[in-house]
Amino acid sequence: MNQYSVPALEPVASNGNLTNYIADRARFEPTRVMLSRPLGEGWQKVTAHELDQEVRVTAKGLIASGIKQGDRVAIMARTRYEWTILDFAIWYAGGVVVPIYETSSAEQVEWILTDSGSVAIIVETPTHKETVTPILPSAVKNLWLMTDNVLAILAKAGASINDDELDQRRNSLAPSDLATLIYTSGTTGKPKGVQLTHENFIAECGNVVAGASDLFLKPGGST
């Protein structure tokens, strides 16, 4: 068997975590457009400052709801704007994201929640809620529904959490800390959790950007 490899274009991170992508951009380039979201017939641009603020208030809501450092929080949904906010909010709060396919069966969801030790789950639709409610393990203390305007609900819940507490959570994460626990499809047995650290994602993102700088770094570039 032949093996091929190429040297990394970017060095492995020695400090920081994934939250720095948003927090640092909000600090140094607050008006820079970070993403666009569908709005009516068009698109709404979201700046670094706006994105950071929405993630922060959502993270405060998670903390107020009992999410502790290192807690696993599951998200069962398609790719959508709320996913991005919740993904980063869980990291800002010091937690670990557990993605679940939106097509997963109740049995699969139960296994993933139990095996991962998740303490909360966010689902996309009422149908998802109906699927997971009967099988929630006792460790799961919170179930949120995206279509119930979960971001606004969490923002309101976190009003009493101060910035210092949030920043302590966010800044305490090291590159080697677990960021996401992704489960395999389970075609040959029970789904297995794959551990991905902040360092894994940072290295991947850094090398992708460096390898496609004409796409990512040119003015106005987007994907």
Language model region names:
Residues K45-H49, A179-G206:
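Conserved AMP-binding A3 loop
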Residues T127-P175:
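ANL superfamily adenylate-forming
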